[in-house]
């Protein structure tokens, strides 16, 4: 399909010929009429290794060459987006340059930041994580050089011919021979869109892909195209989506054995030296092997188990065993992977990702721990923090938000956590391995994934420990890639829909006018009932705020001509607002008076505005990486969850509280405006999206004392209206997430009054003035500890005296004591244990509200656990323990002597056995 889409005037004008590859059967375009292959590996081998196809360029030189070229050709250069895709709610990491403009620009909802534009966008893809270092070409992080044009029905920028022409011209500008370039046809499908595309080949290497996004799933009058069994139809917006691999262009310009040698020459040298293997790259035999390895890798799919097949092919070519080859080049491959991974981490941590067990934080920790595992094998001189810092310096510290000192602290803490994981992981894996071995089963992949996901235990460690236990595990070569794929996209659980079944009815209603935005200080209004069904009232306008953004709905009442109804919930469906009422019936067309619960509304406004202030204060105290993970506002108290790499200390909490209240006392105005999404993102950055990504071309921007967010809630008119902000507590709810609970305004005053009341009551109990309470409590506590020590000393002395006074009877040469003693259960256990350690048997009991009984046995014939169970049953209770020591009790104290007698008989019977 789409064959006609490739019949470009540019191809005809430049003398291109459309041919079919003799190896793969794909169509391609070439200036060389004698050519029979498409130019793509594996149809042809890499020919650029040792024979560069472009003039030599460093990474910086190639990036500037590309961006400058497109600037000269009418494109606007824009700055890169962060690698944490916080403007998206479906993916965590930026995986392509077009992801910068999805979903709103590509859907035509908002205009692009420039048109046409050019960008060099760092991207992170972890789906080939296991191949990095081993294939010679795979990377976790790469820069996608791109130029994009967004064509609309009213404005044509450029399309296919100009895109291919620009590609030709750029490749020629960096020294490429255009007669060696091929354009391979390859229809593109992704994310509900499709279109023709061409892959650009030279020297056996794909250096760019030119995608012409012009088809979508939305049905039109056009008959459509069948692609992979689905129908696609022409879109109104036609998008030029190009991607040139910066690192691949540099590799092809240098002809190095691997992409790592071309892109990271200084870092490869440093890590080789730190690992103590720098001499290997000085060996020409190794260089040849690495180049051959990369060539063969280009000829095959090396994912999964095929990595071993790659080893076999290279080993056969140089006539050594795969095992010997593995020993030779594995250390170098691990160095390559370490270099790649540390650049990936430089971008992740520099762009304020906090390692954790969720979202993008999970992926950061995945890369950190994989890097640490490889570094630990070398016992390197450099630390992980050292290497990441160096990568950040190479990229440019000005390219990152995060301070290097914070990055180092984050990394050092992750190193400590990893060491703890390894220490405790051995016992966990041993238990699992023994379980499967006992069942004569292999340890399945699902179990290994659970051990990694739940406990952080690396698969290599699992494999080694399982082998020692005699268990076999199923561990694929691409384990880390599978894990990364599992966690690369947001998996949202659908919230219960309160209005399920009403969609069609609501869609026919006009939008509700939102008075709560226009008149947030009002509490009464008049409106007309547009519709009423199933206890839901729809009005033409409303002051009632619907639940959303972590803010609960307003409550209140609606008064009609004949009845008054209580509004207990308010929800928004599209642009229509539904009021759930109880205790009344409203009629369509009826005019009603609405009354908001004033105290609740204003308390929610104060708490919502205070949430903004606390977030800003937390950033000021803890660092720029602070990002909201969740929030819930309430009239009495609220909470905000933030991403932070360690527990918040009491001192930090005090500083946050002071900073927040300073902002309140400054009485700065709260500014609310409606702004174009694209312009707002460019001006304020993606920290706008603290509470999620709202839809639409415009954003409601709320500015509160330095905090700027896209927010739909109700807010105070100035920070001074909030009143006091009091932090109630901080809680570590999960790794990398801290929860701050707080109260604002009157609620904060109520809380402080409550604390004062507790303090005053405590002072009354101790008969001291309130200001003398702390030293008095300290003195009492110190005295209590001294008295506790004295009591323990006296108790120990009582035990010693009791032991001295006891006269055991001898049964078969074994000293036996059966006695009631009025001591605490702890002392009973101590006495019984002391006697059993001398080879005797002691059954001791003490009365009280419930009877307590203990049996300690120094003779294997007397099983304490068995006997104590029977005795406790006599007392109406339960007991148990081990053969050497058991205890218990029961409420029937009057049967204590009976229990002791039965116990004595059981002991004697046991000791009389041979």
Curated annotation (Swiss-Prot):
The keyword Nucleotide-binding is assigned to this record: yes
Main location: cytoplasm
InterPro entries named in the record: aa-tRNA-synth_II/BPL/LPL, Ala-tRNA-lgiase_IIc, Ala-tRNA-ligase_IIc_anticod-bd, Ala-tRNA-synth_IIc_core, Ala-tRNA-synth_IIc_N, Ala-tRNA_lgiase_arc, Ala-tRNA_ligase, DHHA1_dom
Cellular component annotations (GO), alphabetically ordered: cytoplasm
A Gene Ontology biological process term: alanyl-tRNA aminoacylation
EC number: 6.1.1.7
Class of this enzyme: ligase
Compartment annotation: Cytoplasm
Entry keyword set: Aminoacyl-tRNA synthetase, ATP-binding, Cytoplasm, Ligase, Metal-binding, Nucleotide-binding, Protein biosynthesis, RNA-binding, tRNA-binding, Zinc
Cofactor: Zn(2+)
Coiled-coil residues: none
Residues that bind Zn(2+): 608, 612, 711, 715
Catalyzed reactions: tRNA(Ala) + L-alanine + ATP = L-alanyl-tRNA(Ala) + AMP + diphosphate
Cofactor binding summary note: Binds 1 zinc ion per subunit.
Described function: Catalyzes the attachment of alanine to tRNA(Ala) in a two-step reaction: alanine is first activated by ATP to form Ala-AMP and then transferred to the acceptor end of tRNA(Ala). Also edits incorrectly charged Ser-tRNA(Ala) and Gly-tRNA(Ala) via its editing domain.
Record's comment describing the protein's domains: Consists of three domains; the N-terminal catalytic domain, the editing domain and the C-terminal C-Ala domain. The editing domain removes incorrectly charged amino acids, while the C-Ala domain, along with tRNA(Ala), serves as a bridge to cooperatively bring together the editing and aminoacylation centers thus stimulating deacylation of misacylated tRNAs.
NCBIfam families from the UniProt entry: A-tRNA_syn_arch, alaS
Designated name of the protein: Alanine--tRNA ligase
Organism expressing this protein natively: Methanoregula boonei (strain DSM 21154 / JCM 14090 / 6A8)
């Amino acid at each position: 399909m789409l064959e006609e889409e490739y019949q470009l005037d540019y191809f005809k004008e430049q003398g291109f010929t459309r041919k079919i590859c003799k190896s793969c059967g794909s169509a391609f375009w070439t200036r060389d009429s004698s050519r029979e292959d498409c130019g793509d590996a594996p149809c042809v081998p890499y020919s650029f290794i040792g024979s560069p196809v472009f003039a030599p360029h460093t990474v910086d030189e190639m990036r500037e060459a590309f961006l400058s070229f497109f600037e000269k050709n009418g494109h606007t250069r824009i700055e890169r987006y962060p690698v944490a895709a916080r403007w998206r709610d479906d993916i965590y990491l930026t995986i392509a340059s077009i992801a910068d403009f999805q979903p709103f620009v590509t859907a035509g909802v908002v205009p692009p930041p420039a048109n046409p534009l050019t960008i060099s966008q760092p991207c992170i893809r972890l789906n080939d994580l296991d191949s990095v270092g081993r294939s010679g070409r795979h990377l976790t992080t790469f820069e996608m050089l791109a130029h994009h044009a967004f064509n609309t029905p009213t404005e044509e920028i450029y399309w296919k011919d100009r895109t291919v022409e620009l590609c030709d011209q750029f490749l020629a500008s960096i020294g490429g021979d255009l007669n060696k370039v091929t354009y391979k046809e390859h229809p593109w499908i992704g994310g509900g869109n499709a279109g023709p595309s061409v892959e650009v080949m030279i020297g056996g290497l794909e250096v760019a892909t030119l995608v012409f996004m012009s088809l979508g799933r939305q049905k039109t009058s056009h008959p459509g195209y069948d692609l992979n069994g689905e129908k696609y139809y022409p879109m109104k917006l036609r998008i030029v989506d190009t991607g040139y691999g910066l690192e691949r262009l540099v590799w092809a310009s240098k002809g190095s054995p691997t992409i790592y040698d071309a892109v990271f020459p200084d870092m490869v040298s440093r890590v080789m030296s730190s690992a103590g293997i720098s001499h290997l790259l000085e060996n020409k035999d190794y260089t040849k092997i690495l180049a051959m390895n990369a060539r063969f890798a280009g000829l095959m799919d090396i994912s999964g188990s095929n990595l071993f097949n790659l080893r076999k092919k290279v080993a056969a070519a140089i006539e050594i065993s795969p095992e010997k080859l593995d020993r030779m080049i594995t250390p170098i491959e691990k160095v390559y992977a370490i270099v790649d991974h540390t650049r990936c981490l430089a971008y992740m941590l520099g762009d304020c990702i906090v390692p954790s067990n969720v979202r993008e934080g999970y992926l950061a920790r995945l890369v950190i721990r994989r890097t640490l595992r490889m570094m630990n094998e070398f016992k390197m001189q450099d630390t992980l923090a050292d290497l990441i810092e160096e990568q950040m310096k190479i990229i440019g510290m000005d390219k990152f938000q995060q301070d290097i000192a914070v990055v180092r602290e984050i990394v050092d803490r992750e190193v400590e956590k990893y060491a703890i994981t390894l220490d405790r992981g051995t016992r966990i894996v041993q238990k699992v391995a023994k379980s499967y071995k006992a069942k004569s089963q292999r340890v399945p992949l699902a179990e290994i994934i659970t051990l990694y996901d739940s406990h952080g235990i690396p698969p290599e460690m699992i494999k080694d420990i399982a082998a020692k236990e005699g268990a076999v595990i199923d561990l694929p070569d691409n384990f880390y890639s599978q894990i990364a794929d599992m966690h690369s996209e947001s998996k949202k659980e659908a919230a219960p829909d309160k209005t399920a079944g009403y969609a069609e009815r609501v869609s026919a209603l006009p939008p509700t006018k939102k008075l709560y935005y226009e008149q947030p200080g009002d509490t009464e209004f008049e409106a007309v009932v547009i519709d009423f069904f199933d206890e839901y009232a729809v009005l033409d306008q409303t002051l009632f705020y619907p639940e959303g953004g972590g803010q609960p709905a307003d409550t209140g009442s609606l008064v009609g001509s004949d009845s008054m109804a209580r509004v207990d919930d308010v929800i928004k469906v599209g642009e229509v607002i539904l009021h759930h009422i109880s205790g009344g019936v409203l009629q369509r067309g009826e005019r009603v008076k609405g009354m908001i619960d004033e105290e609740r509304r204003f308390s929610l406004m104060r708490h919502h505005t205070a949430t903004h202030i606390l977030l800003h204060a937390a950033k000021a105290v803890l660092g720029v990486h602070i990002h909201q993970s969740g929030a819930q506002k309430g009239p009495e108290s609220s909470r905000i969850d933030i991403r932070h790499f360690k527990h918040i200390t009491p001192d930090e909490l005090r500083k946050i509280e002071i900073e927040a209240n300073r902002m309140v006392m400054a009485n700065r105005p709260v500014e609310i405006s409606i702004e174009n999404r694209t312009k707002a993102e460019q001006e304020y950055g993606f920290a706008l999206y603290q509470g999620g990504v709202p839809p639409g071309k415009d954003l409601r921007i709320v500015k509160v004392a330095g905090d700027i967010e896209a927010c739909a809630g109700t807010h105070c008119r100035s920070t001074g209206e909030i009143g006091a902000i009091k932090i109630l507590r901080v809680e570590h709810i999960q790794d990398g997430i801290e929860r701050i609970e707080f109260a604002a305004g009157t609620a904060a005053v109520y809380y402080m009054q409550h604390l004062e009341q507790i303090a005053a009551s405590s002072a009354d109990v101790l008969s001291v003035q309130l200001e003398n309470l702390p030293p008095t409590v300290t003195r009492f506590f110190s005295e209590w500890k001294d008295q506790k020590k004295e009591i323990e000393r006296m108790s120990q002395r009582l035990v010693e005296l009791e032991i001295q006074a006891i006269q055991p009877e001898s049964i078969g040469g074994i000293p036996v004591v059966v006695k009631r003693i009025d001591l605490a259960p702890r002392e009973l256990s101590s006495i019984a244990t002391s006697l059993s350690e001398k080879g005797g048997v002691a059954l001791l009991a003490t009365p009280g509200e419930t009877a307590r009984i203990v049996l300690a046995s120094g003779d294997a014939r007397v099983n304490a656990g068995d006997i104590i169970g029977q005795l406790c049953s006599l007392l109406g209770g339960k007991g148990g323990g081990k053969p050497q020591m058991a205890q218990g009790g029961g409420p029937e104290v009057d049967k204590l002597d009976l229990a002791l007698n039965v116990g004595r008989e059981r002991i004697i019977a046991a000791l009389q056995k041979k």
